[in-house]
């Protein structure tokens, strides 16, 4: 079930979602949160959740998100399939764009168990952060446990982070070193300088 935390303020027992952990400051990952986990999640002051499954989000969970002003971003990626299907690169890229936008932080990433789909997205984030590939793959395997998938490792290895830079039309996320604490968000409009057209005088 995960670690049980006692809230010193009112004695409430707080239960994290399965496989919960911190990725970076204000970025978290986990398995699918149940209603019993939302007390714990409220302590994170989340702004957003990235949900990586195709199934509709439970109505009770949606109500809890609404009451806490948490935005839900759903990217429907199939889990275990027979035969196995490749991870959709464009979908992961879209999720990554949401993830690197600090306006969505604090943010939680989750799929069903918080291992494979979540692990692939976090692995791609690490590549954006310029982690060495061996460390990226090691983190994926550690979080996936005995059920790590070779095809996920190949996906992370082959994922082209240059595509992210090409697709960030209005936001450039600039990393200084490996950490996110010294991050800097630069807002850039597609047309940085837009001259206002003034009415032209007409000759009578």
Curated annotation (Swiss-Prot):
Residues 75-87 are annotated as: WPD loop important for active site topology. Highly expressed in flowers. Expressed at low levels in roots, leaves, stems and siliques. Keywords: Hydrolase. InterPro entries: PFA-DSPs, Prot-tyrosine_phosphatase-like, Siw14-like, Tyr_Pase_AS, TYR_PHOSPHATASE_DUAL_dom. SUPFAM superfamilies: (Phosphotyrosine protein) phosphatases II (SSF52799). The keyword Hydrolase applies. Residues 19-168 form the Tyrosine-protein phosphatase domain. One of its GO terms (molecular function) is inositol-5-diphosphate-1,2,3,4,6-pentakisphosphate diphosphatase activity. It catalyses: 5-diphospho-1D-myo-inositol 1,2,3,4,6-pentakisphosphate + H2O = 1D-myo-inositol hexakisphosphate + phosphate + H(+); 1,5-bis(diphospho)-1D-myo-inositol 2,3,4,6-tetrakisphosphate + H2O = 1-diphospho-1D-myo-inositol 2,3,4,5,6-pentakisphosphate + phosphate + 2 H(+); 3,5-bis(diphospho)-1D-myo-inositol 1,2,4,6-tetrakisphosphate + H2O = 3-diphospho-1D-myo-inositol 1,2,4,5,6-pentakisphosphate + phosphate + 2 H(+); 6-diphospho-1D-myo-inositol pentakisphosphate + H2O = 1D-myo-inositol hexakisphosphate + phosphate + H(+). The active site is at residue 111. Pfam families: Y_phosphatase2. Cleaves the beta-phosphate at the 5-position of soluble inositol pyrophosphates. Has highest activity on 5-diphosphoinositol 1,2,3,4,6-pentakisphosphate (5-InsP(7)). Possesses low phosphotyrosine phosphatase activity in vitro. Dephosphorylates the phosphoinositides PI(3,5)P2. Hydrolyzes O-methylfluorescein phosphate in vitro. Belongs to the protein-tyrosine phosphatase family. Atypical dual-specificity phosphatase Siw14-like subfamily. This is Inositol diphosphatase DSP5. The lineage of its organism: Eukaryota, Viridiplantae, Streptophyta, Embryophyta, Tracheophyta. The gene is DSP5.
């Amino acid at each position: 079930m995960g670690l049980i935390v006692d809230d010193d303020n009112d004695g409430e027992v707080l239960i994290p979602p399965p496989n919960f952990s911190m990725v970076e400051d204000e970025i978290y990952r986990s398995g699918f949160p149940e209603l019993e986990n939302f007390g714990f999640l409220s302590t994170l002051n989340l702004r957003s959740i990235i949900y990586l499954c195709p199934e509709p989000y439970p109505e009770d969970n949606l109500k809890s998100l609404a009451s806490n002003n948490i935005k839900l971003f759903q990217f429907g990626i199939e889990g275990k399939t027979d035969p196995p299907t490749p991870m959709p690169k464009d979908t992961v890229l879209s999720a990554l764009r949401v993830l690197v936008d600090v306006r969505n932080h604090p943010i939680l990433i989750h799929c069903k168990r918080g291992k494979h789909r979540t692990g692939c997205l976090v692995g791609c984030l690490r590549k954006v952060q310029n982690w060495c590939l061996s460390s990226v793959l090691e983190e994926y395997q550690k979080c996936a446990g005995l059920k790590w998938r070779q095809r996920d490792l190949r996906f992370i290895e082959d994922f082209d982070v240059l595509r992210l830079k090409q697709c960030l039309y209005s936001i450039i996320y600039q990393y200084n070193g490996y950490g996110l604490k010294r991050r800097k968000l630069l807002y850039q409009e597609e047309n940085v300088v837009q001259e206002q057209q003034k009415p032209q005088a007409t000759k009578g």
